[in-house]
């Protein structure tokens, strides 16, 4: 019988019971541990990561599980319901979203939670240094049509300062420049701005830069005393630089 009563203790015990069962299943399958990921699309990515660091071990992956109401559920919220039941035999792997940048407590390997550090696993697939290799492997010819590294570096530099403002407002006034608003500003998939291979995306980057500069000018006029330099230094230590911004943005904005 699935489902539990409303009390938080009952919910914790319910998920602790599932965790024990998953760990037991992993042992039965002769795996080192059971691993709950957000959904089935994440399995390949995390399987590759764990294979790299634990080449001699096998893992039992779960792309979803039953929530407290008995419904089969996936996603990061479902993963995080197990936080009180994690250990070396059962752990979770999630997309960081902004959890890494905003120092969300308890989201680390010490608490048996692995994260992407980038916004999501899609950002890793967009890593500039590897895209040429992917194209060459698929097309069986060297990629000389589009310079991914140059495009993503230019894109990152254009949106970097706006992203700093976005992170600033997430701390001080989240409604002022929300995730939705920011993602709309950096969106490059409009019909009027199709990326051209011929000019290495120059036109779409120009249009994006004009849009971003207008928003930056508004923020600078409206909030002249915003202390951004400390924020830049703080995030620089975490790997957020003008050239690497694309790794920390919403993955689908970059991936699409």
Task: State where each predicted segment sits.
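Acidic, divalent-metal-binding catalytic cores of TOPRIM
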Residues: 1-256
